[in-house]
Protein backbone atom coordinates (compact mmCIF):
# COMPACT_ATOMS: atom_id res chain seq x y z
CA UNK A 1 0.00 0.00 0.00
CA UNK A 2 1.19 3.56 -0.73
CA UNK A 3 1.65 6.53 1.55
CA UNK A 4 2.73 10.11 0.92
CA UNK A 5 5.62 11.43 3.00
CA UNK A 6 5.41 15.22 3.20
CA UNK A 7 8.18 17.45 4.53
CA UNK A 8 6.30 20.62 5.37
CA UNK A 9 7.12 24.29 5.61
CA UNK A 10 7.81 25.03 1.95
CA UNK A 11 6.11 27.92 0.20
CA UNK A 12 4.55 26.93 -3.13
CA UNK A 13 5.34 29.14 -6.10
CA UNK A 14 4.82 28.60 -9.83
CA UNK A 15 2.24 27.44 -12.33
CA UNK A 16 0.48 24.15 -12.96
CA UNK A 17 -2.18 22.90 -15.39
CA UNK A 18 -5.51 21.51 -14.20
CA UNK A 19 -6.42 17.97 -15.21
CA UNK A 20 -9.68 16.94 -16.81
CA UNK A 21 -12.61 16.42 -14.47
CA UNK A 22 -13.22 12.95 -13.08
CA UNK A 23 -16.75 13.91 -12.12
CA UNK A 24 -17.64 14.71 -15.73
CA UNK A 25 -15.54 11.91 -17.26
CA UNK A 26 -17.54 9.13 -15.59
CA UNK A 27 -21.03 10.05 -16.88
CA UNK A 28 -19.58 10.89 -20.30
CA UNK A 29 -17.96 7.45 -20.51
CA UNK A 30 -21.24 5.89 -19.37
CA UNK A 31 -23.10 7.81 -22.07
CA UNK A 32 -21.07 6.08 -24.78
CA UNK A 33 -23.20 3.01 -24.00
CA UNK A 34 -26.16 4.83 -25.57
CA UNK A 35 -24.77 4.39 -29.09
CA UNK A 36 -23.79 1.30 -31.02
CA UNK A 37 -22.43 3.26 -33.96
CA UNK A 38 -18.77 4.15 -34.47
CA UNK A 39 -15.95 4.96 -32.07
CA UNK A 40 -15.87 7.73 -29.48
CA UNK A 41 -12.68 9.73 -28.92
CA UNK A 42 -12.65 11.43 -25.53
CA UNK A 43 -9.84 13.89 -24.75
CA UNK A 44 -8.61 15.25 -21.41
CA UNK A 45 -9.66 12.17 -19.47
CA UNK A 46 -7.62 12.00 -16.23
CA UNK A 47 -5.46 8.94 -15.55
CA UNK A 48 -7.11 7.88 -12.30
CA UNK A 49 -8.08 4.68 -10.52
CA UNK A 50 -11.78 5.50 -10.80
CA UNK A 51 -11.44 5.94 -14.57
CA UNK A 52 -9.64 2.60 -14.81
CA UNK A 53 -12.36 0.90 -12.74
CA UNK A 54 -15.15 2.40 -14.82
CA UNK A 55 -13.40 1.43 -18.05
CA UNK A 56 -13.13 -2.14 -16.75
CA UNK A 57 -16.87 -2.05 -16.10
CA UNK A 58 -17.87 -1.02 -19.61
CA UNK A 59 -15.33 -3.49 -21.02
CA UNK A 60 -17.11 -6.21 -19.03
CA UNK A 61 -20.35 -5.13 -20.71
CA UNK A 62 -18.73 -5.61 -24.12
CA UNK A 63 -17.23 -2.22 -24.96
CA UNK A 64 -13.76 -1.95 -26.47
CA UNK A 65 -11.51 0.76 -25.06
CA UNK A 66 -8.02 2.16 -25.44
CA UNK A 67 -6.39 4.79 -23.20
CA UNK A 68 -3.23 6.78 -23.91
CA UNK A 69 -2.03 10.31 -23.08
CA UNK A 70 -5.36 11.26 -21.49
CA UNK A 71 -7.33 10.22 -24.58
CA UNK A 72 -9.85 7.41 -24.29
CA UNK A 73 -11.37 5.70 -27.33
CA UNK A 74 -14.55 3.70 -26.83
CA UNK A 75 -16.47 1.42 -29.19
CA UNK A 76 -19.77 0.12 -27.85
CA UNK A 77 -21.19 -1.70 -30.87
CA UNK A 78 -20.54 -5.10 -29.30
CA UNK A 79 -22.12 -4.44 -25.91
CA UNK A 80 -24.19 -7.50 -25.06
CA UNK A 81 -24.01 -8.01 -21.30
CA UNK A 82 -26.58 -6.01 -19.34
CA UNK A 83 -25.20 -7.02 -15.94
CA UNK A 84 -22.85 -4.76 -13.95
CA UNK A 85 -21.30 -7.17 -11.42
CA UNK A 86 -20.64 -6.64 -7.73
CA UNK A 87 -16.88 -7.21 -8.14
CA UNK A 88 -16.58 -3.99 -10.16
CA UNK A 89 -19.51 -1.92 -8.90
CA UNK A 90 -18.44 -2.29 -5.23
CA UNK A 91 -15.34 -0.22 -5.93
CA UNK A 92 -17.19 3.01 -6.73
CA UNK A 93 -20.67 4.44 -6.43
CA UNK A 94 -20.49 6.08 -9.86
CA UNK A 95 -20.95 2.62 -11.38
CA UNK A 96 -24.69 3.30 -11.05
CA UNK A 97 -24.26 5.59 -14.08
CA UNK A 98 -24.52 2.57 -16.41
CA UNK A 99 -28.13 1.97 -15.33
CA UNK A 100 -29.71 4.77 -17.37
CA UNK A 101 -27.83 4.18 -20.64
CA UNK A 102 -28.32 0.39 -20.63
CA UNK A 103 -32.00 0.74 -19.78
CA UNK A 104 -32.52 3.36 -22.50
CA UNK A 105 -30.70 1.44 -25.24
CA UNK A 106 -31.64 -2.16 -24.43
CA UNK A 107 -34.79 -1.82 -22.34
CA UNK A 108 -33.31 -3.53 -19.30
CA UNK A 109 -30.30 -3.54 -16.99
CA UNK A 110 -29.07 -5.23 -13.83
CA UNK A 111 -26.63 -3.36 -11.61
CA UNK A 112 -25.17 -4.39 -8.27
CA UNK A 113 -25.90 -2.05 -5.40
CA UNK A 114 -22.91 0.32 -5.37
CA UNK A 115 -20.04 0.93 -2.96
CA UNK A 116 -17.78 4.00 -2.88
CA UNK A 117 -16.99 6.76 -0.40
CA UNK A 118 -17.17 6.17 3.32
CA UNK A 119 -19.02 9.22 4.63
CA UNK A 120 -22.72 9.27 5.47
CA UNK A 121 -25.71 7.94 3.53
CA UNK A 122 -25.72 8.53 -0.23
CA UNK A 123 -28.92 6.79 -1.33
CA UNK A 124 -29.66 5.82 -4.91
CA UNK A 125 -33.39 6.28 -4.36
CA UNK A 126 -33.48 9.32 -6.67
CA UNK A 127 -31.88 7.35 -9.51
CA UNK A 128 -34.50 4.63 -9.17
CA UNK A 129 -37.35 7.12 -8.84
CA UNK A 130 -36.29 8.72 -12.13
CA UNK A 131 -36.18 5.37 -13.92
CA UNK A 132 -39.64 4.49 -12.58
CA UNK A 133 -41.02 7.83 -13.78
CA UNK A 134 -39.72 6.93 -17.25
CA UNK A 135 -41.64 3.66 -17.15
CA UNK A 136 -39.15 1.17 -15.72
CA UNK A 137 -40.15 -1.59 -13.35
CA UNK A 138 -37.55 -1.84 -10.56
CA UNK A 139 -36.81 -4.82 -8.36
CA UNK A 140 -34.03 -5.14 -5.77
CA UNK A 141 -33.08 -8.68 -4.80
CA UNK A 142 -29.89 -10.35 -3.51
CA UNK A 143 -27.97 -7.08 -3.72
CA UNK A 144 -28.85 -6.30 -7.34
CA UNK A 145 -31.07 -3.67 -8.97
CA UNK A 146 -32.97 -4.97 -12.00
CA UNK A 147 -34.75 -2.43 -14.18
CA UNK A 148 -36.98 -3.29 -17.14
CA UNK A 149 -38.79 -0.87 -19.41
CA UNK A 150 -42.45 -1.68 -19.90
CA UNK A 151 -42.92 -2.87 -23.49
CA UNK A 152 -39.15 -2.63 -23.92
CA UNK A 153 -39.00 1.16 -24.31
CA UNK A 154 -38.79 4.04 -21.85
CA UNK A 155 -41.43 6.78 -22.10
CA UNK A 156 -40.89 10.50 -21.60
CA UNK A 157 -42.19 11.85 -18.31
CA UNK A 158 -41.93 14.65 -15.78
CA UNK A 159 -39.26 14.05 -13.12
CA UNK A 160 -39.39 16.37 -10.11
CA UNK A 161 -36.35 15.83 -7.91
CA UNK A 162 -37.09 16.70 -4.25
CA UNK A 163 -33.42 17.60 -3.76
CA UNK A 164 -30.66 18.42 -6.21
CA UNK A 165 -28.56 15.37 -7.13
CA UNK A 166 -25.75 15.36 -9.67
CA UNK A 167 -25.73 11.59 -10.06
CA UNK A 168 -29.49 11.20 -10.38
CA UNK A 169 -29.72 14.10 -12.83
CA UNK A 170 -27.04 12.52 -15.00
CA UNK A 171 -28.71 9.12 -14.97
CA UNK A 172 -32.12 10.62 -15.76
CA UNK A 173 -30.64 12.60 -18.64
CA UNK A 174 -28.99 9.56 -20.18
CA UNK A 175 -32.16 7.51 -19.87
CA UNK A 176 -34.39 10.26 -21.28
CA UNK A 177 -32.47 10.99 -24.48
CA UNK A 178 -33.64 7.70 -26.06
CA UNK A 179 -37.07 7.61 -24.40
CA UNK A 180 -40.17 8.10 -26.52
CA UNK A 181 -41.55 11.62 -26.21
CA UNK A 182 -40.70 14.56 -23.97
CA UNK A 183 -39.08 14.45 -20.54
CA UNK A 184 -38.97 17.42 -18.17
CA UNK A 185 -36.52 17.31 -15.26
CA UNK A 186 -37.09 19.90 -12.53
CA UNK A 187 -34.70 20.77 -9.70
CA UNK A 188 -32.00 19.31 -11.92
CA UNK A 189 -28.40 19.68 -10.80
CA UNK A 190 -26.76 22.61 -12.60
CA UNK A 191 -23.13 21.67 -11.89
CA UNK A 192 -20.63 22.23 -14.73
CA UNK A 193 -20.22 18.45 -14.97
CA UNK A 194 -23.94 18.07 -15.83
CA UNK A 195 -23.62 20.92 -18.32
CA UNK A 196 -20.72 19.05 -19.93
CA UNK A 197 -22.80 15.87 -20.11
CA UNK A 198 -25.61 17.81 -21.80
CA UNK A 199 -23.18 19.18 -24.38
CA UNK A 200 -21.75 15.71 -25.00
CA UNK A 201 -25.20 14.18 -25.45
CA UNK A 202 -26.24 17.03 -27.75
CA UNK A 203 -23.16 16.48 -29.90
CA UNK A 204 -24.25 12.83 -30.22
CA UNK A 205 -27.63 13.98 -31.53
CA UNK A 206 -29.70 14.34 -28.36
CA UNK A 207 -32.26 17.14 -28.15
CA UNK A 208 -31.88 18.97 -24.84
CA UNK A 209 -33.09 22.41 -23.77
CA UNK A 210 -32.12 24.26 -20.60
CA UNK A 211 -28.47 23.22 -20.42
CA UNK A 212 -26.85 24.88 -17.41
CA UNK A 213 -30.18 25.49 -15.65
CA UNK A 214 -32.23 23.58 -13.08
CA UNK A 215 -34.94 22.64 -15.59
CA UNK A 216 -34.03 20.35 -18.47
CA UNK A 217 -36.36 19.47 -21.34
CA UNK A 218 -35.40 16.42 -23.39
CA UNK A 219 -37.11 15.32 -26.58
CA UNK A 220 -36.26 11.67 -27.13
CA UNK A 221 -34.57 10.54 -30.34
CA UNK A 222 -34.32 7.09 -31.90
CA UNK A 223 -30.53 6.83 -32.12
CA UNK A 224 -27.28 8.57 -31.19
CA UNK A 225 -23.87 8.65 -32.88
CA UNK A 226 -20.26 8.38 -31.71
CA UNK A 227 -18.38 11.69 -31.55
CA UNK A 228 -15.10 13.31 -30.52
CA UNK A 229 -15.27 15.28 -27.28
CA UNK A 230 -12.93 17.26 -25.01
CA UNK A 231 -13.61 17.02 -21.28
CA UNK A 232 -13.89 20.01 -18.95
CA UNK A 233 -11.30 20.88 -16.29
CA UNK A 234 -11.44 19.52 -12.75
CA UNK A 235 -12.64 22.48 -10.70
CA UNK A 236 -12.11 20.61 -7.41
CA UNK A 237 -8.49 19.79 -8.26
CA UNK A 238 -7.97 23.42 -9.30
CA UNK A 239 -9.48 24.63 -6.02
CA UNK A 240 -7.28 22.22 -4.07
CA UNK A 241 -4.14 23.51 -5.80
CA UNK A 242 -5.14 27.11 -5.02
CA UNK A 243 -5.70 26.10 -1.40
CA UNK A 244 -2.19 24.63 -1.36
CA UNK A 245 -0.84 28.03 -2.38
CA UNK A 246 -2.93 29.79 0.26
CA UNK A 247 -2.01 27.48 3.15
CA UNK A 248 1.74 27.69 2.43
CA UNK A 249 1.86 31.46 1.95
CA UNK A 250 2.66 31.02 -1.71
CA UNK A 251 1.65 32.28 -5.14
CA UNK A 252 0.39 29.79 -7.71
CA UNK A 253 -1.20 30.01 -11.16
CA UNK A 254 -3.53 27.23 -12.29
CA UNK A 255 -3.88 27.10 -16.07
CA UNK A 256 -6.46 25.36 -18.24
CA UNK A 257 -9.46 26.48 -16.19
CA UNK A 258 -12.70 28.43 -16.57
CA UNK A 259 -12.69 30.87 -13.62
CA UNK A 260 -16.46 31.37 -13.73
CA UNK A 261 -16.97 27.77 -12.61
CA UNK A 262 -14.94 28.48 -9.45
CA UNK A 263 -16.65 31.77 -8.65
CA UNK A 264 -17.97 30.73 -5.23
CA UNK A 265 -14.59 29.33 -4.17
CA UNK A 266 -12.63 32.34 -5.42
CA UNK A 267 -14.98 34.64 -3.53
CA UNK A 268 -14.14 32.82 -0.28
CA UNK A 269 -10.40 32.93 -1.02
CA UNK A 270 -10.74 36.71 -1.47
CA UNK A 271 -12.65 36.99 1.83
CA UNK A 272 -9.78 35.10 3.47
CA UNK A 273 -7.39 37.81 2.30
CA UNK A 274 -5.94 36.16 -0.80
CA UNK A 275 -5.30 38.18 -3.94
CA UNK A 276 -6.96 36.63 -6.99
CA UNK A 277 -6.04 37.40 -10.61
CA UNK A 278 -7.86 35.88 -13.57
CA UNK A 279 -7.53 35.49 -17.31
CA UNK A 280 -10.04 33.59 -19.48
CA UNK A 281 -7.97 30.41 -18.98
CA UNK A 282 -6.08 30.82 -15.71
CA UNK A 283 -6.34 31.79 -12.05
CA UNK A 284 -3.49 33.14 -9.92
CA UNK A 285 -3.71 33.16 -6.13
CA UNK A 286 -1.31 35.08 -3.90
CA UNK A 287 -1.59 34.29 -0.20
CA UNK A 288 -1.71 37.12 2.36
CA UNK A 289 0.63 37.49 5.31
CA UNK A 290 -2.26 36.54 7.60
CA UNK A 291 -5.31 34.53 6.57
CA UNK A 292 -8.68 35.90 7.66
CA UNK A 293 -11.16 33.41 9.18
CA UNK A 294 -13.93 32.78 6.66
CA UNK A 295 -17.09 30.72 7.15
CA UNK A 296 -18.37 28.48 4.36
CA UNK A 297 -21.60 26.59 3.79
CA UNK A 298 -21.36 23.81 1.22
CA UNK A 299 -24.46 23.57 -0.99
CA UNK A 300 -25.23 22.56 -4.59
CA UNK A 301 -23.72 24.58 -7.45
CA UNK A 302 -23.29 27.51 -7.85
CA UNK A 303 -22.67 27.66 -4.08
CA UNK A 304 -19.48 26.50 -2.38
CA UNK A 305 -18.90 22.84 -3.36
CA UNK A 306 -19.04 20.06 -0.79
CA UNK A 307 -15.97 18.56 -2.46
CA UNK A 308 -13.91 21.60 -1.30
CA UNK A 309 -15.22 21.59 2.27
CA UNK A 310 -12.47 19.43 3.78
CA UNK A 311 -9.71 21.40 2.05
CA UNK A 312 -11.18 24.65 3.35
CA UNK A 313 -11.22 23.23 6.85
CA UNK A 314 -7.48 22.57 6.61
CA UNK A 315 -6.87 26.09 5.30
CA UNK A 316 -8.80 27.70 8.16
CA UNK A 317 -6.52 26.06 10.75
CA UNK A 318 -4.05 28.78 9.71
CA UNK A 319 -6.49 31.72 9.84
CA UNK A 320 -6.41 34.10 12.80
CA UNK A 321 -9.72 33.50 14.55
CA UNK A 322 -12.79 31.27 14.41
CA UNK A 323 -14.23 29.78 11.23
CA UNK A 324 -17.44 27.77 10.86
CA UNK A 325 -17.73 25.00 8.30
CA UNK A 326 -21.23 23.77 7.40
CA UNK A 327 -22.09 21.11 4.82
CA UNK A 328 -25.70 21.10 3.63
CA UNK A 329 -25.02 18.37 1.05
CA UNK A 330 -23.44 15.67 3.24
CA UNK A 331 -24.09 16.61 6.86
CA UNK A 332 -21.69 14.00 8.25
CA UNK A 333 -18.72 14.72 5.99
CA UNK A 334 -16.26 15.36 8.82
CA UNK A 335 -14.12 12.21 8.89
CA UNK A 336 -11.03 14.33 8.30
CA UNK A 337 -11.38 16.34 11.50
CA UNK A 338 -9.99 13.81 14.01
CA UNK A 339 -6.92 13.42 11.80
CA UNK A 340 -6.46 17.19 11.49
CA UNK A 341 -6.65 17.43 15.27
CA UNK A 342 -3.92 14.78 15.49
CA UNK A 343 -1.71 17.20 13.57
CA UNK A 344 -2.43 19.92 16.13
CA UNK A 345 -5.57 21.59 14.80
CA UNK A 346 -8.29 22.73 17.20
CA UNK A 347 -11.61 21.77 15.62
CA UNK A 348 -14.88 20.84 17.30
CA UNK A 349 -18.03 19.44 15.73
CA UNK A 350 -21.22 21.03 17.05
CA UNK A 351 -24.60 20.15 15.53
CA UNK A 352 -23.23 19.18 12.11
CA UNK A 353 -20.94 22.20 12.01
CA UNK A 354 -17.16 22.24 12.36
CA UNK A 355 -15.77 25.08 14.47
CA UNK A 356 -12.14 25.80 13.56
CA UNK A 357 -9.95 27.84 15.91
CA UNK A 358 -6.79 29.27 14.41
CA UNK A 359 -4.05 29.83 13.80
CA UNK A 360 -2.57 26.57 14.99
CA UNK A 361 0.98 25.39 14.51
CA UNK A 362 0.66 21.91 13.03
CA UNK A 363 3.20 19.17 13.69
CA UNK A 364 3.81 16.27 11.34
CA UNK A 365 2.74 12.76 12.29
CA UNK A 366 1.03 9.74 10.71
CA UNK A 367 -2.55 10.35 9.60
CA UNK A 368 -5.08 8.10 7.89
CA UNK A 369 -7.09 8.92 4.77
CA UNK A 370 -10.76 7.95 4.99
CA UNK A 371 -12.09 9.26 1.68
CA UNK A 372 -11.01 11.18 -1.40
CA UNK A 373 -11.36 14.78 -0.21
CA UNK A 374 -10.25 13.97 3.34
CA UNK A 375 -7.01 12.74 1.76
CA UNK A 376 -6.53 16.05 -0.03
CA UNK A 377 -7.24 17.93 3.20
CA UNK A 378 -4.51 15.99 5.03
CA UNK A 379 -2.02 16.63 2.25
CA UNK A 380 -2.70 20.37 2.55
CA UNK A 381 -2.20 20.20 6.30
CA UNK A 382 1.04 18.29 5.78
CA UNK A 383 2.34 21.04 3.49
CA UNK A 384 2.23 23.57 6.33
CA UNK A 385 3.02 21.26 9.27
CA UNK A 386 6.42 21.24 10.96
CA UNK A 387 8.48 18.13 10.32
CA UNK A 388 7.28 15.07 8.43
CA UNK A 389 3.66 14.07 7.82
CA UNK A 390 2.80 10.60 6.53
CA UNK A 391 -0.58 10.33 4.83
CA UNK A 392 -1.59 6.65 4.77
CA UNK A 393 -4.08 4.90 2.48
CA UNK A 394 -3.55 7.31 -0.39
CA UNK A 395 -5.44 4.98 -2.70
CA UNK A 396 -8.35 7.24 -1.77
CA UNK A 397 -6.40 10.20 -3.17
CA UNK A 398 -5.52 8.30 -6.34
CA UNK A 399 -9.22 7.85 -7.08
CA UNK A 400 -9.61 11.55 -7.84
CA UNK A 401 -6.29 13.39 -8.15
CA UNK A 402 -3.99 12.86 -11.11
CA UNK A 403 -0.31 12.84 -10.06
CA UNK A 404 -1.04 15.25 -7.22
CA UNK A 405 2.37 14.87 -5.57
CA UNK A 406 4.14 15.57 -8.88
CA UNK A 407 2.11 18.74 -9.39
CA UNK A 408 2.75 19.96 -5.85
CA UNK A 409 6.46 19.10 -6.09
CA UNK A 410 6.69 21.13 -9.31
CA UNK A 411 5.56 24.11 -7.21
CA UNK A 412 8.18 23.53 -4.52
CA UNK A 413 6.67 20.93 -2.20
CA UNK A 414 8.73 18.00 -0.89
CA UNK A 415 6.55 14.90 -1.20
CA UNK A 416 7.59 11.31 -1.84
CA UNK A 417 5.43 8.25 -2.41
CA UNK A 418 6.51 5.17 -0.48
CA UNK A 419 5.26 1.64 0.08
CA UNK A 420 4.21 0.48 3.53
CA UNK A 421 2.51 -2.45 5.19
CA UNK A 422 -0.85 -1.53 6.67
CA UNK A 423 -0.42 -2.73 10.26
CA UNK A 424 3.32 -3.23 10.52
Swiss-Prot record:
Its EC number is 2.5.1.7. Pfam families: EPSP_synthase. One of its GO terms (cellular component) is cytoplasm. It comes from the Bacteria. Pathway: Cell wall biogenesis; peptidoglycan biosynthesis. GO terms for biological process: cell division; cell wall organization; peptidoglycan biosynthetic process; regulation of cell shape; UDP-N-acetylgalactosamine biosynthetic process. This is UDP-N-acetylglucosamine 1-carboxyvinyltransferase. Its main location: cytoplasm. UDP-N-acetyl-alpha-D-glucosamine binds at residues 93, 122-126, 307, 329. The active site is at 117 (proton donor). InterPro entries: Enolpyruvate_Tfrase_dom, Enolpyruvate_Tfrase_sf, MurA_subfamily, RNA3'P_cycl/enolpyr_Trfase_a/b, UDP_GlcNAc_COvinyl_MurA. Belongs to the EPSP synthase family. MurA subfamily. The keyword Ribonucleoprotein does not apply. The keyword Cell wall biogenesis/degradation applies. It is an enzyme of class 2 (transferase). It is found in: Cytoplasm. The modification 2-(S-cysteinyl)pyruvic acid O-phosphothioketal is found at residue 117. Keywords: Cell cycle, Cell division, Cell shape, Cell wall biogenesis/degradation, Cytoplasm, Peptidoglycan synthesis, Pyruvate, Transferase. The gene is murA. One of its GO terms (molecular function) is UDP-N-acetylglucosamine 1-carboxyvinyltransferase activity. Phosphoenolpyruvate binds at residues 22-23. It catalyses: phosphoenolpyruvate + UDP-N-acetyl-alpha-D-glucosamine = UDP-N-acetyl-3-O-(1-carboxyvinyl)-alpha-D-glucosamine + phosphate. Gene3D superfamilies: Enolpyruvate transferase domain. Cell wall formation. Adds enolpyruvyl to UDP-N-acetylglucosamine.
Amino acid sequence: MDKLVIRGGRRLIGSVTASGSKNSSLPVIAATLLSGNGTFTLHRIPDLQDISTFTQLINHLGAQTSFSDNTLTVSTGNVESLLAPYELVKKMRASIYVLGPLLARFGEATVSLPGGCAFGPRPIDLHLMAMEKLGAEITIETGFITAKARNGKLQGARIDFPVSSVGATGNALMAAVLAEGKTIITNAAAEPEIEALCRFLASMGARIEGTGTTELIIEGVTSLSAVEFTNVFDRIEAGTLLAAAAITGGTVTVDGVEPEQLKSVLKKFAHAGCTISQTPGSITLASPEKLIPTDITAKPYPSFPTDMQAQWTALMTQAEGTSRITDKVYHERFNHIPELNRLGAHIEIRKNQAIVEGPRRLSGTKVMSTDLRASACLVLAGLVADGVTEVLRVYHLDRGYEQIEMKLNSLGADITREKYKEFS
